[in-house]
Amino acid sequence: MFEAVENGSADYGVLPIENSTAGDIRQTYDLLAKYNFYICKRTQIKINHCLAAKPGADIKTIYSHEQALKQCFGFLKDYHARQVPYTNTALAAEMVANSDDNTIAAICSERCAELYGLETVKRDIADNPDNTTRFICISKRPEATPDADIISICMSLPHTTGSLYRMLIRFALYGLNITKIESAPVPQAKQDIKRETFDVVFYLDFEGNALDPEVVRLMTILEEEMKYFKFLGNYKHFD
């Protein structure tokens, strides 16, 4: 998807970034750091997983995206079938439908099971009945609008005493509320960050608008002080 947006064959891309059960989707964050794309919208959707297979299947192996497998951990723990991560839930269902192997199944949506002619073996198998995933829409250009109210950035801090404190206190001094902060290993493919063993980048979401001069001033200061800084986008919360 990132390559499609990069080469112009798609204007926008939509991908998951966080799940209420399994947490952050690390691959998405790594891709945001690697490519020069921007988040322009964000929304959240309740996800209902089911176990799907061909009629009469003797299920020994279950395929699905690794996030779906994590979200259904409790169900799978008691099912005693081998779990195999797959590209995504839809492709897992397609693979099961096209296979001659009658011992495999997929975790996917009921709609997907219907689409590929699979039988729903078990409905609502996610551990959390309110299992919800946040999705972002990305574009090649930033799309700041007057009603955008969340800004996402990532940065790598200098290895000096108090650097994290000094970064965080700036948000308080500017009256900007941080809604999320996560640290993660520096993506292997990120060449413009000087990487050391166990070095990390911080991903932050905070309330603000990129058209606000005070917000621009803060991000300018951070860009000057950090080892690495990247603006990831400004968008409306759950637009």
Language-model region placement:
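Domain-level signature for soluble enzymes in the chorismate/prephenate branch of the shikimate pathway
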Residues: 1-239
